[in-house]
Amino acid sequence: MSEQDSSSPKYMRFLLGNFTSAEMVTDGNFLIYCIEMGLLVIGVLENIFMIGAVFSTSCLHLNLRILICNCCLGFILMAVGRAMIAVPLCIAHLRDVDISSHAWCFIANAVHHSSADSVCLSFVFIMLERTAGTIWSKDYEKTKIHIFPCIFAFLQWFIPMFMILGNFLDRANRMEHFLLYPHLPCQIEYLTPTMFMITIFIIVIGFIASVGGITIVYNKNIKKYNTRDIWFNTVNLSERYQITENIRSTHLLFPLLALMLIFSTLSVSVLIYGGYWVSVMTKEPARFEEVVKWFGRGGEAAQLFDIITAIYTISFPICAFICHPNLFRFLRKFIGWNSYAVRPSNLNEIGGFEMSTAPIRTQTEFHFQELSRQWNT
């Protein structure tokens, strides 16, 4: 692709030219990065608060609490990965200096991608944990077997890290393609096409398995709950509690899965849109102005993906608090909006308190006066 005819061409990601670091991060890029960082700060604080809330309540089984907190940790690390990418680019725009390197940006992308994959896989392992709670509902609440969540949490991170290793070893690396054009290291997409397709495949299969598995678990627990034989034996109180909690926790997961489906659909739509205009620019350079109009000089349209992810980071804890009664009660108590609490009354506010300190004769007279008043009315 040849350089533009103008002696000082305007920057565009897929045009050759001698551009400065400040030019390679457009004003639109910088503004979107600032908005994204603001949203991610809110999301990180919410997820930290949710971790504290989940571990502070005993309404959920400890195994489930571990996996939910592991999911929140994935959101936090995903935000950290994005900050590692966005902050050097913002500095490049403001100070016209690139403080990053390919090693730094590869690690940042690895943290971001592995955390995003871990979040998507979290529902699969939560579904497996709820399946175990359904199968062994009689003893699951009393038996403290924490090897399940430890193995599940390990796999939840091992699979994405294994995929990152495969991406690093993939020969179809896109580094040479991106280095042909003026890009800062953190503007390069280090995920190869092969690993991108594998990632999408695993996420889709995991989502289908999560929805199907949670639906089966929910219906199975409803069927157990409607079985009246277990309610007349005090020995089975633990089973009764476990079945009830299985229903409440799986009921919580359906809105979270719906939330994941909505944001995943939006994200994939943005990726398809961005991929289309990138292919147009690389194959039909004459359509330069059209690409600039619909994709942006700095690929601003593709940054909608990061904004959607940041909004998802914020929405996940909010949805969890609203959909689970005990978590919602914890939130209301924390912010002081607790209608369940009974305001303590002072003794002098209680009706008839003044008579409690009066002499016995006065109390007796008052008692018969009240009786006379009631009989005469």
From Swiss-Prot:
Keywords: Cell membrane, G-protein coupled receptor, Glycoprotein, Membrane, Receptor, Transducer, Transmembrane, Transmembrane helix. The chain crosses the membrane at residues 35-55, 72-92, 106-126, 145-165, 196-216, 252-272, 304-324. It is a multi-pass membrane protein. Residues 1-34, 93-105, 166-195, 273-303 are extracellular. One of its GO terms (cellular component) is plasma membrane. It is found in: Cell membrane. Glycans are attached at residue 18. Coiled coil: none annotated. Its main location: membrane. The keyword Nucleotidyltransferase does not apply. InterPro entries: 7TM_GPCR_serpentine_rcpt_Srab, NRL-GPCR1. Residues 56-71, 127-144, 217-251, 325-377 are cytoplasmic. GO terms for molecular function: G protein-coupled receptor activity. PANTHER family: G-PROTEIN COUPLED RECEPTOR F27E5.5-RELATED, SERPENTINE RECEPTOR, CLASS E (EPSILON)-RELATED. Belongs to the G-protein coupled receptor 1 family. This is Probable G-protein coupled receptor F27E5.8. It comes from Caenorhabditis elegans. The lineage of its organism: Eukaryota, Metazoa, Ecdysozoa, Nematoda, Chromadorea.
